[in-house]
Amino acid sequence: MIKLIATDVDGTLVEDGTCRINPEYFTVIQQLRELGIQVAAASGRQADSLLSLFEPVRDKMFFISNNGGVIGTSSRILFVANMDETLLQKLLEDCKAFPDCYLLLSAAEESYYLEGCPEDFVHLITEEYRFGAEPVKDWKSLPPIVKAAIYHDPALPHPARVLIEPWRGRLTGVVSGREWVDFIGPGVSKGRALREIMESLEVSAEEIMVFGDQMNDLPMMEQAKHSFTVGGAREEVKAAAAHVTAPMQEDGVLQVLKNLVKNKGEFT
């Protein structure tokens, strides 16, 4: 019997950068909880964006935010992995070489962007993602930072390789959706965060389902026997997944979850 479901959000349940979700997900999450199945949303987003997205069922879920940097529920934070301050400052210096990219730094409960960022970027993070983000004059005197997210125009060449390679072994750099490259502490990932939840609930790999579509979902998918990706996901993710559902636009994950409810939590 399945005891825990963990799912990515952007590109898996919703269009990247939006909070428009099929309300049937709320119904099926409620039904899963009635069957005793726990549900976790795992995302590069910060916690308040996830809480807003899942508002009707927020009190019934776990939330893995900031690509594994924070684990919590609607009422409390369970785990935080802050970045090393010295490494963070060096990363911020390196990012100055990319004038077409914009930074969003996330603490456990708040995010920050520089004053003067383009209005489109500010609208994206505050209105589309619904991040609780504050403008700051500089990066000084901020609370401990969990994640540095680098946004780039999806119409431009993806800077992931150039950004990530120099930091390999010192920070974890991951592609998070079409427009973001995220940096978190070494060893931090959705997979590590999911493992923390699995151990606390005493859930095995055979008792969990995981859904994802991007490279940052692979560590999480490795924790589960029943790993799924959606049609339209990256080919590397399809190759790693045990199953491929219908595309996100066709609510492929919802179809799987409905069948699981129909079968009383048994996956066949």
Predicted feature residues:
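Mg2+-dependent phosphoryl-transfer enzymes with acidic/Ser/Thr/Gly-rich catalytic loops
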Residues: 1-4, 22, 182-268
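Asp-based phosphoryl-transfer active-site loop
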Residues: 3-18
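Short, acidic loop-to-helix structural element flanking the phosphoryl-transfer center
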Residues: 18-37, 80-87, 129-132, 188-199, ...
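Active-site phosphate-binding/coordination module
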Residues: 23-121
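Short active-site oxyanion
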Residues: 36-40, 59-61, 146-147, 206-207, ...
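Short, structured coil segments at secondary-structure junctions
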Residues: 56-59, 67, 166-169, 223-224, ...
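Conserved acidic, metal-coordinating active-site core of Asp-based
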Residues: 94, 99-211, 215-223
